Amino acid sequence: MVNNGGNIAKLANELSDERHAALITSDISRRYFCGFTSSAGIILVTKEASYLLIDFRYFDKAKERVSDCEVILLENAKTQLMNLLIKHGITTVSVESDAMTVTELEKYKANYTFVTFDSSCGLSEMIGKMRIIKTPEEIEKIVKAQRIAERAFSRLLRDIKPGQTEKHVAALLEYYMAEY
């Protein structure tokens, strides 16, 4: 299980009341809040609970790795999200203004007329500020990555030879980092 230093709880605490939720749609924010990388999925955060709705390609792995959200197999996004919004009595949903297109926002507004979708609430900025302050877990990952990079680069310096292309050297470095 991945521990993300309570990032979901921090976001939930920023919500104004029990009828307010945050909808996380960007890959980067999903990874930040769940510690899980995927090319699809959404996170719904309420004061009471949080949910990761994710498709079949990632579902089993997400169930194993994600601890801060209830992981739900994404089958019918419109219906599933509607049921969660109704279940929690949500009337306002903050969205990431820098991650959602106008077209996507309009679709959400059309599909969920009982909810106000707010792109001007500063959710993207709030997430950005949260990401600036590193948790102990994040610092540990940074230190580990730095050590891997240093070991790989030291090895690369021993193996690099005149006449090798940049692509070859880059491939070697990438290979060495993967080894460590």
Stretches with model-predicted labels:
Residues 1-88, 147-148:
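N-terminal accessory/capping or targeting/presequence segment of soluble
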Residues 3, 79-180:
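Flexible, acidic/His-enriched mid-domain "rim/lid" segments that flank
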